[in-house]
A protein has these predicted regions:
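Portal/gating segments that form or line small-molecule/metal binding sites
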Residues: 75-90
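Bilobed "Venus flytrap"/periplasmic-binding protein-like clamshell domains
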Residues: 3-25, 86-145
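N-terminal hydrophobic or amphipathic helices and topogenic motifs
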Residues: 1-79
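Short, flexible loop segments at the rims of nucleotide/cofactor-binding pockets, characterized by
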Residues: 33-36, 83, 122-125
């Protein structure tokens, strides 16, 4: 019997690596399915989910209302929490009021990071930067936060 291949799309970030570890290392096996992994940044995954491109994909909470007609939320797999994320980084300590009007690096407009920041402090200038380059953007001054 031929195995049906399912593409598992997720980011290369450590939280997604942890969530998909069992499938990626074939520690979770199926006699019916073969899982192939596609690694992309979260904003790209959000956009591709809007087109229903993958059978199984990681997305942002913010993106889900836009793809709810194509995907179900699984009972496990989340990367939001106190002291974990989303979080802001800056060269020096800042208050919420200090964020007003600042250029803030975000990993995309459909991300949970952008949504929660917009609720916390709606008056900022979003600077879209791939997730893995946010620290560099703050360090080199492309973004204030």
């Amino acid at each position: 019997m031929d195995l049906k291949e399912i593409v598992c799309a997720h980011s290369p970030d450590s939280d997604d690596a942890y969530m998909f570890y069992g499938l990626a290392t074939r520690k979770v096996r199926s006699k019916l399915l073969n899982f192939r992994h596609q690694l992309e940044d979260i904003q790209s995954l959000n956009r591709r989910a809007m087109n229903g491109e993958y059978e199984l994909t990681a997305i942002s909470y913010h993106a889900y209302p836009y793809v709810a007609d194509k995907y179900y939320v699984m009972a496990s797999g989340s990367s939001v929490g106190d002291g974990y994320g989303p979080m802001l980084v800056a060269q020096h300590p800042m208050s919420v009021d200090d964020l007003k009007g600042k250029r803030i690096a975000i990993p995309g407009r459909l991300t949970t990071a952008f949504l929660t920041l917009s609720i916390l402090q709606p008056d900022f200038v979003p600077v879209e930067v791939p997730f893995d380059r946010i620290l560099d953007a703050v360090k080199d001054g492309t973004a204030d936060v």
